[in-house]
Structures are given as structure tokens and as C-alpha cells.
Amino acid sequence: MMKKRKLSLTVIVLVLLMLAFTSTCFADTVVKETAKTGIIGAMDEEVNSLKEALEEKRVSTIAGMEFCEGRLDGADVVVVKCGVGKVNAAACTQILIDRFEVDQIINTGVAGSLDAAIDIGDIVVSTEAVQHDMDVTVLGYDRGEIPYSGKSVFPADEEMRTRAIEAVKAAAPKVHAFEGRVSSGDQFIASHEQKDSIISSVGGLCCEMEGAAIAQVCSLNEIPFVIIRAISDKADDSEEMSYVEFVEAAAENCAAITRYMVAHK
């Protein structure tokens, strides 16, 4: 009788362990199926149309930023305006990761062209990002290199890059898309001198003010990311006029591409 009881207890324990294992696997599957995409823009023009398209929208205000959760064309997303600059972008990215548990991040918005072949209205999809204003060269570091980290560039996720290029072709077929380095810094580039300095020091296809900070935080947290930027100006002496004239149209184009990308994950 004792042997039968022991055998029964053993069977029960094995069944419970199998159920626990099955539940864990199912939970993992659910997490993957309901995974969220964080979408960050610095300005209203870059995120407003995405926010307006959200279904089942829920808004949380954290650190002065409005995080809008919801469904975007069937995908779970969190859309947020981080504000201008690298500090805002970095703080926003960490909140998306910690509070909203996003599994990937898209940075959408506008940028200035650093390449003569890239014109206003074109799209740049990041292969990597660098901070052009990180300058500790006086201590022997390369321009853009972050001291004690050994890092200066942060590679974008290859699968996300591929989907971004596909999204450009589908959502904006008349737009030219380029893949390459995005250079970020807390400067609004509006002169040939500034532009030439960036090109000669760290290079890049375009310049803006948030992408590399988002990339660095994503790298620290092992979260895949991609930066998608529509060109609104040439980052030179014609900056002010072209930026004001084209920023809204460029941002809307980029938002449409981002929307297509999350809907076809």
C-alpha cells in the first residue's frame, strides 16, 4: 500500500511539473503575441497622426511625457513625444522599456541631410547611430566615442531595418530611401561650418537631435531599434526656410512609413 501511495504521489508531482512547464511556455507565447512597439518622436508633428490613429487609447503621463498606449492597425504600440534633445530621448526610452515593457523601439521624425545625394523628402533608415557632439578627443578618444565604454556607434537591428525599407517601398513608393549612419547631437545644424565639421569627424547621412541617445539606451537594455528619418532640410545656411516649409510634410511621410511597418510586423 505504501508503495502505491508513493507511486501516486510521484505521478502527481510529475503532472504538476508538466502543467507548470506548459503554463510557462504558454505565458511566453502570450507575451510574444502581445509584444509592444515603442514609437518615439521629438515633436507633435512627428507623432500626432499616429496618436490620432490609435484604437483603445490609454494615456499615462510620466516625467512630463504623455505615453499613449493602444492598437495601431492591429499592433500593440506606445506612442510618445519625448521632446527635443538627447536627455529627453534617453529618459523617454528607458521609461518605455521599464514601465511599458516594449520589445522594440522605432524613432520617427525629421532630420537634416549631410549627403548631397539625399534631398528634402527622402528617407534615411539607420544602420547605426553616433553622437557627433561627444568629444573627448583631448584625452585620446575618437570623436563620438563614449569614455570607458569602448563604444562610439550603436548598430540598428537588421530585421527592423529590412522592414523599414520595405515599408518605404509600400507606403511611399515615390520616395527615395537610403540606409546609413545617423548622427545626433544637441545642436540644430544650420551652417556649412557645422555641417562640414560633422561630416569630417563622424560622418553620416543625416543629422538630428535624439536618435543616438535612443540607440544607446536600447543597446544598454538589449532592445532592438531602428531610426527612420524624413529629410526636412539640407542642414546648411538655407536651413530655416526649408525646415519651416517642409517639416510637417516630411514628418507625416515618416509617420505613414512607421505605421505601415508596425502593421506588417
PLM segments and residue spans:
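General helical secondary-structure elements
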Residues: 1-2, 225
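Bacterial N-terminal signal peptides that target proteins for export
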Residues: 2-12
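Intrinsically disordered, low-complexity Ser/Thr- and Pro-rich stretches
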Residues: 5-7, 17-18, 29
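Bacterial N-terminal signal peptides
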Residues: 11-22
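Sec/Tat signal peptide C-region and signal peptidase I cleavage site
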Residues: 24-26
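Glycine-rich phosphate- or other oxyanion-binding loops that anchor nucleotides, phosphorylated ligands
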Residues: 28, 32-37, 60-265
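Short, conserved "active-site rim" segments that organize catalytic pockets and cofactor/ligand binding
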Residues: 34-54, 76
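Nucleotide and nucleotide-moiety/phosphate-recognizing core
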Residues: 57
